[in-house]
Amino acid sequence: MESWLFLLLIALIAFVAKNQSLLIASVVVLALKALPNSAKIMSWLSDKGINLGVTIISITILVPIATGQIGLKDLIQSFKTPMGWLGILCGILVAVLSSKGVGLINQSPEITVALVFGTILGVVFLKGIAAGPIIASGMMYVIITTFQAFQH
């Protein structure tokens, strides 16, 4: 019963905060929880959900390449500017940090609770987004802003 109330509370907070992604996620999890054999579905999502999410984000990132909005010349151009190099470095850093983070979660599963709670707080109250590659652009923003502040 506690999990139902917790999920409903998250859905309510998401609704009040007008966070559509978290609202949809909590309603979907509530709906899945109501299904017979939900333990199997939840177990599968728990095991494969991050990979599924990363796959969907990767597809989204590749769409501009497929539509021709981004081409090989754009990739080459990214190596010619400091912003391009910074973007590449931030992407590498996020990939490495993510792999270390997954290792930490596997070693200390109790960290997951704090991460989930922190993510919910960030998404709801700070208008954040629970997404991995987006973090790279956020890190890039911080680095660029810091760099620009020291230039003036």
From Swiss-Prot:
Topology in membrane: Multi-pass membrane protein
Locations listed in the record: Cell membrane
Keywords: Cell membrane, Membrane, Transmembrane, Transmembrane helix
Source species, domain of life: Bacteria
Transmembrane segments: 4-24, 52-72, 85-105, 115-135
Regions annotated as coiled coil: none
A cellular component term, taken from the record's GO annotations: plasma membrane
Entry keyword annotation includes Cell membrane: yes
Principal location listed in the UniProt entry: membrane
Family, per entry: Belongs to the UPF0756 family.
PANTHER family in UniProt: UPF0756 MEMBRANE PROTEIN YEAL
Protein name from the UniProt record: UPF0756 membrane protein EF_1246
